[in-house]
Amino acid sequence: LDSGVLGRLCAPVVERELEIWVVGLLQRGRKVLIPEVCDYEIRRELIRNRSASIAQLDGLAKTFEYLPITTPAIRRASELWAILRQTGVPTAPDDSLDADCVLAGQALVAAEAENRSVVVATSNVGHLVRMVDARVWQEIA
């Protein structure tokens, strides 16, 4: 899950379509992962806004599998960050951490570790699709 989808799952009232979609994935035995970088992006805003949704985010981390940031993932993210700039299509300013690169690095390393394909569920494929298989969440079954 990218931060857009994860954030919507943390809303006080989760959209019914999104809830049905994620429950369906779990029922079909699909892994639903919360990348640590996305947890960070959502959690910092929830803390800043003093939101009660932090408990919901913590609950999701218990329901879904948590994907920690690892050294191989950060190294892959660094490669992606550099390649995007070398080819003239950066996804964030040069002084930015660029969470999309970190998320893509996490996804690629997870795919290699498990020897299976990984699809990032997002609400905006624009940046992510340059680095990893990313699809609008409604298109993932």
Pin down the residues of each PLM region:
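Histidine- and aromatic-rich ligand-binding microenvironments
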Residues: L1-D2, I34-P35, S96-L97, A121-V125, ...
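Short, mixed-charge aromatic SLiMs
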Residues: K62-L67, L128-R135
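Short, hinge-like loop/turn segments at secondary-structure boundaries
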Residues: N49-S53, L84-R85, Q138-E139
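A generic structural signal for short hydrophobic patches within well-formed alpha-helices
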Residues: L6, D39-I42, I74, L128
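Hydrophobic helix-cap positions at the C-terminus of alpha-helices
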Residues: G24-L25, L60, L84, A110, ...
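Active-site neighborhoods of divalent-metal-dependent phosphate/nucleic-acid chemistry enzymes
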Residues: E65-S123
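Short aromatic-enriched loop/helix-cap "lid" or pocket-rim segments at secondary-structure transitions
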Residues: P12-V13, L46-I47, L80, M131-R135
